């Protein structure tokens, strides 16, 4: 039942994107995310590495820039031929990750199903993450924090190195996602 509730809220919230042909197109998404991800998808479709991005200033190296997320694992979605589908899947994946990881973290803390659902929905609809969604590189980095916290706490309680490794992997995702300051916040 909790999964169904979360799914229903998610579908209602993203109904315009899922069913009405709308897309995410505001603030940094409009100026950076959409054009850079489109360029990344086109270059990868040609079987090349995205060394140079010609559409920023008079051209700039793309791979060393953090915010395009060239080496960020979820960017693999841009290998999908249908760019708009990949773009939506990319953004929706991060919202789903946020909702499910907040729910999982709350349940790990032995909070009630209702409290966990409330925290999960608040993370989706609340001001912090809602405002970060327009600054996509910070958003896609910040959503990993609940998983990092849960893995770190499991490592501290159980002492298993696998949880430490998972926390480190998720921190690396924060860096590769283009928001390295989020990894600093996570470590603190």
Q: What are these language model-derived features?
A:
Residues 9-102, 121-146:
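Membrane-interface coil-to-helix junctions
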Residues 1-4:
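N-terminal membrane topogenic signal
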Residues 6-9, 99-108, 113-188:
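Membrane-embedded helix bundles of polyisoprenyl
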